[in-house]
Amino acid sequence: MKYSFAISAGNSAMVQMEDYLNFLIDDSNTKVIALYLEGVKNPHKFEACLQKAMEKKKPVVILKAGRSPKGQATAASHTGSMAGSDKTYDAVFEKFGVIRADDMQDLRSTASLLATLRVLPRKPAFSAMCLSGGETAVSADTGFLHGIEYPDFSEATLKKLNDMLPDFATPRNPLDMTAALCYDADAFSSGITTVMSDPSIEMGLVGLTISDKVTVSNDIMFEGIRRAFEQIPDKPLAVMSFMEAARNKELVERFQNAGIPVLPTTKYGFRALQHLQDFILHDTIKCEARLAIPEAHSANTRALSEYESKKLLADNGVPVDLGYIAKTKAEVKEYAEKIGYPLVMKVESNDILHKSDVGGVMLNIKSLEQAEEAYDKILANAAQHAPNAKINGILMQKMLKAGTEMIIGLNSDPQFGPMLLVGMGGVFVEVFKDAALYPVPLNHDEALHMLQALKSFKLLNGYRGNPPADIEALTDMMVKISDFAYRKKDTLKELDMNPLFVYPKGEGVAIADALAVMYEEEK
């Protein structure tokens, strides 16, 4: 791999990482930026850099320290940068198409692949071509584990391959080219060219064992790959080395100089291809390429009651049923007649955030008698379990019909601003941690992308006879909540909407409960 610059930033006391990044994005001799990052000192500059890299389609590959608590502590003490939440960095990187490397070898392998490729594939559609059945099977399995797309060959391609391969070979993608082709550069080149000419294939991967101990066919393989590479100028080729430790370094250099990257081992090779695939797919999503970076705010916070939280949402364009706060039995009767049955009644208090824990919620109330009993019981429970809480009254609302339970939340990162979280309710988010996190603001494409990232997305799409959920209404709700968070980026700390019911397609969504925590102004 060739370098335009190799920069050691030290402790970044004078020139910061964001300054180097900005310079390298503008530098025409730098094709790919590989960066070790401990933290960000200037989030506004960092945002501007990522926006520019995205506009120029210049890949940025980052090895970010701080996946563990000790890693975060070490990074913070080293440079004084804010390490920040690791998941927040993942979300910011995803928004701007930044590739996050797992370790130093992954950083190098991915940067080398992107820097050496003559052109990038137009879409993620790969073919792996190997010289043995074992290597072909490994390529198929490892590619599958990394989500690599292997399209089927066309009938025309299959016919051509059948004509050139031995009778015992069965052409498919990934392709076992058999050892018969590696002793003839013309035959080897013809096999690769046939595959690369298939309209469904955008990039080829040739698996080789280029060991110092097996050199008989090295020149033939190099020449065959080079010829194919020249015949298909609009599609990239890469070589996968199956034996990294003993590979022929001279041959690797010949490939690299010809513009054909050599990927080290299947582990790092397919991980680099996965990064490449993600980078290409990022272009297919229309992104709001900006963040909601907050100004400095007070350390003091105040939790809003459910009614106050919902009122805040309603005032900012988020559809929600406010209900009524009853402070007397007479008001219970008045509001019950206005709302209609069945009802839900809840304790309304800024001091009781988890109402169910104190017996402060009564569901499915079907008559005035039950409503009056619920009023008395909720007040008694609150007095018993939260005697010091100030009670504002009893919140009365229409009982929502059951739907698919989702959770939507917001949490404001001190550097990058509000992050929107979405996941299935209940055990999916609590036990399986099946949730997606993404920076505000977001649009409908990004909201849908978040939902599709959930392991449980199939449940929303209709599963085993259940109707598909109203995904359009759900993404619309996510965008409205994102817009709200963007407007309140300087004052909002947290927002939790759990549960949010999603109904069948065409029937909408409904927020059942909401809790907002706001930063208080300095006095």
Task: Go through each PLM region and give its residues.
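Catalytic-core regions of core metabolic enzymes
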Residues: M1-K523
